[in-house]
Every structure is written in C-alpha cells, then in structure tokens.
Amino acid sequence: MALTKERKNEIIEAYATKQGDTGSPEVQVAVLTEQITTLNDHLRTHKKDHHSRRGLLKMVGRRRNLLTYLRNKDVSRYRSLIERLGLRR
C-alpha cells in the first residue's frame, strides 16, 4: 500500500528541524525509508513485479546519496538519524 498523506505528515512532523520543514535531509531520508519499507513488503508477495523493484532501487540510491550528503555536512546529525531510523545495524 502506498504512503498515505496522514502517515507522511506524521513522519515529517517527527523528523522536521523546524516548523514547515519538508526538505531537510532528515525528513527526506525518513520519508524514503518508510516508502522503501512499504515497497519491500509489496515485493515479498509480488516477486515478479520488476517495475516496482526498479523504483525501489532508485529510492535506495536516492536515500544513499542523501545520507552521504548529511554525513559529509554534519556527522552528529547523520549518526542520530541512523540511530532513530534503525539503519546500519
């Protein structure tokens, strides 16, 4: 199932650095992570859905680029985001 507006707004509020913040790397990575998780569950049941798999790989690449940017810009923000999202165990 796709990400609903309500769920997306919850994620934005949880990871925003200030009021109305939708473009910070933290928010973008959090939204992408939620979309990746949802799409991953979809692909577990629909193994031959290659179009969605391609979209998943694009999202993973975009998230990786944003995380690299954040790591180079501010390591403490990067580490706290990784810990909050449960990435890189």
From Swiss-Prot:
Cross-referenced InterPro entries: Ribosomal_uS15, Ribosomal_uS15_bac-type, uS15_NS1_RNA-bd_sf
- Per the UniProt record, one Pfam family is Ribosomal_S15
The GO terms describing molecular function are: rRNA binding; structural constituent of ribosome
Q: Which PROSITE patterns match?
A: RIBOSOMAL_S15
State the UniProt keywords alphabetically.
Ribonucleoprotein, Ribosomal protein, RNA-binding, rRNA-binding
- GO terms for biological process, alphabetical: translation
Under the heading CDD domains, the entry gives: Ribosomal_S15p_S13e
- How does the record describe its quaternary structure? Part of the 30S ribosomal subunit. Forms a bridge to the 50S subunit in the 70S ribosome, contacting the 23S rRNA.
User: What HAMAP family does its record include?
Assistant: Ribosomal_uS15_B
The entry sums up its family as follows: Belongs to the universal ribosomal protein uS15 family.
Function, in words: One of the primary rRNA binding proteins, it binds directly to 16S rRNA where it helps nucleate assembly of the platform of the 30S subunit by binding and bridging several RNA helices of the 16S rRNA.
Name of the protein in question: Small ribosomal subunit protein uS15
